[in-house]
Amino acid sequence: MTNDFIYTTYIKTTPEKVWAAITNPEFARQYWGNHTNISDWKKGSEWKHSPDEGKNIKMIGKVLESTPPKRLVITWASPDNRADESQVAFDIAMVEGMVRLDVVHSKLSADMAKGISFGWPLVLSSMKSFLETGKAIDIMAIKGGCGSAKGQAA
């Protein structure tokens, strides 16, 4: 039995737009509850997830692999508990005229697994809606908001 969280979605868009949705702070802000992902996205670089351009950091990590627009692998931890570090892989591929996005969040503690299993579906559904329609889901309005449980993807 694995403790990995695996989420696959198909999005009517391009790999470049999915890559930008994940890595461009202003793009991410549109669908990720006004939060941004900040980094230069080069292997070995640090990244941070923040609602206010890095002043209030919610998640941190390092870029382990970066192959735009196909694959991004990062470590993922709360700045308050760096020892509870996990790993997220984003694999982006064209399939039958649409993008298949596979997100695998691995090396999860029980606490982290609980939070991200609620957060990732909200965030990724919002990204899909935003890329396909131009309108994101208000993930902060969903019962408790995306950031209400420790370790969630927001």
Please tell me what each predicted stretch does:
Residues 9, 60-65, 86-93:
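Hydrophobic/aromatic beta-strand elements that line small-molecule binding cavities or substrate pockets
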